[in-house]
Amino acid sequence: MKTPHFAIIGAGTAGLATAILLAREGNHVTIFEQVDELSPVGAGLLLQPAGLAVFEHLGVLDKALTLGAKVTGLEGQLPDKRLLVNSHYREASTNLYGLGIHRATLCHVLTQKLNEYSSQITWYMNHSVERFEEHNDEVRIFGSHQNQKFDACFDGLLIANGARSQLRPKAWVKVDKAYPWGAAWSIVPECQVLDSEILHQFYDRSKIMMGILPTGAIPTEPQQHLSSVFWSLPTPQLQSFLQDEQAKQAWLKQVSERWPKVAEWLKEILYNSQTQPKWLSANYRDVVMTQFGQGRIGVIGDAAHAMSPQLGQGANMALLDAWAFSQSLQHAQKNQNIDWPLLWQHYHQLRGSSTQFYQFLSRLLTPLYQSDHWWAGGLRDLVFPWMYQIPYFRKEMAITISGLKTGPFRHLEYDQVAQLPKESSAFNLKSESLTDF
């Protein structure tokens, strides 16, 4: 019997994690990536407990812990020093925590694991996949490499090439639009003036938002601990951020008037010739799909559900996609034959309501932090502190931030993901469609 052979388009978090799990189950995987080499660009990110559960399932958690920075919670401060957000993972469960990690480290950890299955993995770097055709017994992809056309056949295709993917089936896409706000970001030496186990955010109305995330270290310099700094801006202003001395002084004044201790630290960083930060821009998209897979085709990661980073769930959702596809394949695979309708039914049961919940919450909350609405910040500042006084809401917000929610009143347990047995029938899943809340 022929071993199933999957093509994965894109070697980001979703693509790499899925490749590991498919190879571990004995499948063949070919990865197509349009860049020459993997050199991830981006600020640090926060792996929530849900993502770390998948890391444990993948067998890479211990390695990640040696390079990442343990994060116990999120604190968001207003200019008057009040904590608007004060959410700690222990409110959800005493053993939960997050991990701040550099994107290069995340990529390193996953590719090192993938190398253990090198006999089942084929890489095609600098290969751009432009279209595909699905047939009864195969999927044929078409693309180009160094101005030469190529095509190849596979049993299944997973599209994992990011938020701006042009490959996801247009008929499945309900929303695909750029966010009007993005972020300027930089990676700097570890912030010593704030608690190094907390993601710190700072807000003033809905126009000013800054974040400082413990980011751990990169594999080549494991002793140098880092922090990521984010500053929220409307997208048209990103390219001009801190372009000259006057802009630097104006920005430091803006921060100093609100959070002087942080401003002093930023000033040291900005004017230290050895640590002078390089600022880059991050733009975001909102992508909502009516389904994530059908037949031999699937869409995972940001290609399937890109959203604002407000809830910090992008990488975690990508990892959960990988886990869910692996579980669904095991559920639908008998003697190397795949029951594709059953696979996607199971996958949508695992990922549909959870993705829906986080996208709904992201669309609801993002304008309260990043918008020109005069009322947004005031409403947020009134409601949030009140909610944190109520133990039930504190716990629910901690579970939400953990990435484990599957709906307003349901959530996964960490161990369900981390140590799920092959027989995934213990979930008691019921069919759910991808309708809006």
Where are these regions (language model features)?
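Residues at the starts of beta-strands that form the adenosine-phosphate
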Residues: 5, 28, 226
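Glycine-rich FAD pyrophosphate-binding loop
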Residues: 23-43
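Conserved N-terminal glycine-rich FAD pyrophosphate-binding loop of Rossmann-like flavoproteins
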Residues: 36-56
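Conserved FAD-binding catalytic core of PHBH/FMO-like flavoproteins
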Residues: 111-116, 122-280
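Conserved N-terminal helical subregion
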Residues: 2-6, 23, 50-171, 175-187, ...
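Conserved mid-domain beta->alpha element of the FAD-binding
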Residues: 11-24, 32, 158, 278-374, ...
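Conserved Rossmann-like nucleotide-cofactor binding loop
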Residues: 14, 37, 164
